[in-house]
């Protein structure tokens, strides 16, 4: 299992930075502060905006981005108090960079496999537990992925020779493809649970057996029943995870998302494509939405939408859809959210499809259009809203067309 030195290296921010530099892995410029005065000196040297990351905390507790000098004192005090050893890392901000995760497993013989790549829909600046995530990564070029894979294995080997699971987080500059190591979790984590469900690979079970001395090639593959656990899963489907917040029960809570995790759970959608998985995840949230739009609950005030796009909250995904429907330009949405254009184009495609569906009635909609809508994750209730009819009528029409659930 994981040894104490690996935990010490990954949880102590300064030791992590120094070890990554020794391994040749890029890290953000920054330094450790154990007092208020040290933190002030580092901030003056690095400049704003910057990030405060307390040592030995979970869920990003006490951390945050600081845009202006006048907000720094309160943020630094908060971070120092959150850390049980009164220590924070003050580092340069990479707000807006793309964020990725890799799930790894290693045995005592040094065999390493990558179980899954995970891409954050939201850019750097939002805790990964509060970010919509997609598996496998959608916008990662193969050359960058191969570099990231090599770095992840180097990082895992560099923090100790333990056997078990490991989660490695990276940030990638969208303009230059520069890769920076954010953190390593040398354990089965929240992301491991997602990767396990997404791939069907029993990460926790295998990691436990590796920790007591088994090797990957000695363990059976529960899926095939004939091969070993020494393989890397390949997905022909897409997983979308959307966090679930419960701000209504916490009156007065700050709903803006940042480095400190605020979600209380999550849902997962599975589809043959990103759009289908996204719609299914939205339908599973239990927030009285039929999916991503097509339910008459769109926000139509431009000023509120622009403010929401710039200041991420739990409903920003829905507001991106609303902004596109209202005619706010792709350039503006891209500039305010820093979300990869590929994801935004996927949402734009859904809006164009809805416009096409609205041209018909339930009796005249072509079977090809109905099939396309279902393949992109639309529920019967959403299609009924677009056709201005009852859900039961859409269900009946779909059955007549021979379009059934799989």
Where are these regions (language model features)?
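Flexible, Lys/Arg-rich cytosolic regulatory linkers and terminal tails that connect or flank
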Residues: 8-14, 399-406
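Short, basic interhelical loop/turn and adjoining N-cap
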Residues: 335-345, 384-397
């Amino acid at each position: 299992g994981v040894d104490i030195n690996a935990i010490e290296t990954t949880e102590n921010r300064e030791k992590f930075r120094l070890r990554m530099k020794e391994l040749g892995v890029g890290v953000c410029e920054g330094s450790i502060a154990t007092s208020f005065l040290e933190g002030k000196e580092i901030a003056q040297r690095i400049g704003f905006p910057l990030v405060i990351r307390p040592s030995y905390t979970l869920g990003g507790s006490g951390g945050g981005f600081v845009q202006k000098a006048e907000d720094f004192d309160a943020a630094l005090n908060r971070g120092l108090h959150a850390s049980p050893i009164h220590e924070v890392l003050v580092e340069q901000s990479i707000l807006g960079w793309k964020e990725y995760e890799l799930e790894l497993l290693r045995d005592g013989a040094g065999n390493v496999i990558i179980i899954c790549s995970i891409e954050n829909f939201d850019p750097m600046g939002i805790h990964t537990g509060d970010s919509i995530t997609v598996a496998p990564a959608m916008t990662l070029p193969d050359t960058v992925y191969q570099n990231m894979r090599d770095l992840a294995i180097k990082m895992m080997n560099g923090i100790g020779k333990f056997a078990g699971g490991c989660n490695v987080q990276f940030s990638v500059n969208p303009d230059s493809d520069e890769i920076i190591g954010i953190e390593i979790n040398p354990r089965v984590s929240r992301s491991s649970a997602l990767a396990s469900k997404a791939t069907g690979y029993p990460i926790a079970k295998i990691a436990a057996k590796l920790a007591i001395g088994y090797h990957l090639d000695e363990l059976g593959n529960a899926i095939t029943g004939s091969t070993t656990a020494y393989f890397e899963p390949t997905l022909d489907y897409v997983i979308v995870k959307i966090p679930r917040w419960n701000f209504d029960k916490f009156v007065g809570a700050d709903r803006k998302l940042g480095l400190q995790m605020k979600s209380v759970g999550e849902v997962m959608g599975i589809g043959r494509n990103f759009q289908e998985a996204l719609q299914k995840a939205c339908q599973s949230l239990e927030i009285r939405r039929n999916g991503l739009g097509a339910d008459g609950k769109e926000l139509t005030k431009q000023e509120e939408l622009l403010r929401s796009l710039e200041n991420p909250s739990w409903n920003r995904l829905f507001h991106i859809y609303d902004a596109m429907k209202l005619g706010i330009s792709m350039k503006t949405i891209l500039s305010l959210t820093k979300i990869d254009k590929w994801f935004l184009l996927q949402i734009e495609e859904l809006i164009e499809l809805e416009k096409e569906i609205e041209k018909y009635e339930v009796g005249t909609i072509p079977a090809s259009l109905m099939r396309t809508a279902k393949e992109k994750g639309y529920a019967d209730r959403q299609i009924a809203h677009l056709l201005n009819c009852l859900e039961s009528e859409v269900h009946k029409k779909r059955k007549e067309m021979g379009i059934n659930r799989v």
